[in-house]
Amino acid sequence: MAITQERKNQLINEFKTHESDTGSPEVQIAILTDSINNLNEHLRTHKKDHHSRRGLLKMVGKRRNLLTYLRNKDVTRYRELINKLGLRR
């Protein structure tokens, strides 16, 4: 369920804004989105896992706050990220 270090490094390399970037909003949102998608698949098969569902809701809230921050700070970066991740259909 947890995201592997290898996958996390792959996401960081894909979404980084500069060479030593690991904590920009884009990277954080990409990592959260991947974790949310994995947890969503888990919850489809384990419908009564309420403990994990609460973790999912917390991650969705955190991602939402980061997206709001990015939208207020730089709309073009926000739109690029939304398109790249396939959010907001």
Swiss-Prot record:
GO MF annotations, alphabetized: rRNA binding; structural constituent of ribosome
UniProt keyword Transmembrane helix present: no
Keywords assigned: Ribonucleoprotein, Ribosomal protein, RNA-binding, rRNA-binding
BP term (GO), one: translation
Biased composition (Basic and acidic residues): 1-21
Record family assignment: Belongs to the universal ribosomal protein uS15 family.
Subunit structure as annotated in this protein's UniProt entry: Part of the 30S ribosomal subunit. Forms a bridge to the 50S subunit in the 70S ribosome, contacting the 23S rRNA.
Lineage: superkingdom: Bacteria
Protein role: One of the primary rRNA binding proteins, it binds directly to 16S rRNA where it helps nucleate assembly of the platform of the 30S subunit by binding and bridging several RNA helices of the 16S rRNA.
A UniProt-annotated Pfam family: Ribosomal_S15
CDD domains assigned to the protein according to its UniProt record, in alphabetical order: Ribosomal_S15p_S13e (cd00353)
Region (Disordered): 1-24
Entries under PANTHER family matching the protein: RIBOSOMAL PROTEIN S15, BACTERIAL AND ORGANELLAR, SMALL RIBOSOMAL SUBUNIT PROTEIN US15M
Record field: transmembrane: none
Protein's UniProt name: Small ribosomal subunit protein uS15
Gene Ontology cellular-component terms listed: cytosolic small ribosomal subunit
